[in-house]
Amino acid sequence: MKFIAPAALLAVLQAASASPVDIRTSTTGLQVTLSQVDNTRIKAVVQNTGSQEVTFMHLNFFKDASPVKKVSLFRDSMLHPILSSCNDEVKFEGIKYRVQSSNLSDKVLTSLAPGASFEDEFDIATTADLSSGGPITIRSQGTVPLVKDRSIKGRIPYTSNELTIEVDGAEASKIGTVGSKVKRTELSGCSGDRGAALETALQNAVSLANKAASAASEGGEAFTTFFKDDSSSTRETVAARLKAVAEEAGSTSGGSTTYYCTDTLGYCEQNVLAYTLPSQDLIANCDIYYSELPALADTCYDQDQATTTLHEFTHAPGVYSPGTDDLGYGYDAATALDTDDALNNADSYALYANAINLGC
């Protein structure tokens, strides 16, 4: 893992241009209706189908202007036999990030009364390579963070219709993914206060990840709280990913990732702590990583710099493949996941490492 100062990056475009609440019932949630606008441009109408007003954080969801994963894309091998096996998911090439769990700004919150809706248009070619064209099936489901008193207090489920479109590959290639538009020139390492803070965070991440890996190998109450299953295979999977994170965090001149001290690509929205571009194994910290987070938390399940760095490392497939997603932010949402989703959730590892470190 190499860490880089902001001045060392030339990011340019290529010439191509209180009590936890868990709303999880079949009659309550958000319904997403997907439709095609033009080729790879998609419109989503998000409606509150429940009987009460809800407020949620729309970061990493529809209405987020950054290239986040709003939908899943699939190819059918019967129609595209050379490129994929049956119903293969198209690789996501956008960004993933960790957000603050409290002190949330109005700018990242959406409130919907019963029956109310909002629209969002986005281009799926910015987060997936669709240059080969052909039929693509699109759908979306998951949960979005429920917010009360400006803090994440649970989750709201959402689901969509299934939409199949015919993609013009030549047109899609003109859009290009986020990763394809990034050129990097590495000139020097992080320096100053931010460089020192990141070095400390990396050292702490090594310690936390190693402790958590050892604890995961043994299982126990904290393990089942986050990962539900105490089987040897689950313990081995968690331990292996955490060991890989420790190894990567301890390698500041090599490894698989490049770590930037500041927002190199311009995706640090309000309340975003750090982000990862998995297709490039690139990680970048945002300003509030330094201004809002302590080096290490002294309270169970609070956020800090070390676990935020650990969170981002789990997103990077170069550290441990496949990289994780963001399926549940914060303790309430993370501990409500089943085993499969917990193993694929970045915050589950970060929160578990915090729990082991503090003896929660």
From Swiss-Prot:
It catalyses: Preferential cleavage of bonds with hydrophobic residues in P1'. Also 3-Asn-|-Gln-4 and 8-Gly-|-Ser-9 bonds in insulin B chain. It comes from the Eukaryota. Glycans are attached at N103. Residues 19-184 form a propeptide. GO terms for molecular function: metal ion binding; metalloendopeptidase activity. Pfam families: Peptidase_M35. The keyword Amino-acid biosynthesis does not apply. Its cofactor is Zn(2+). Its main location: secreted. Residues 1-18 form the signal peptide. GO terms for biological process: proteolysis. PROSITE patterns: ZINC_PROTEASE. Disulfide bonds join C190-C261, C268-C286. Zn(2+) binds at H311, H315, D326. Belongs to the peptidase M35 family. This is Neutral protease 2 homolog AN3393. It comes from Emericella nidulans (strain FGSC A4 / ATCC 38163 / CBS 112.46 / NRRL 194 / M139).
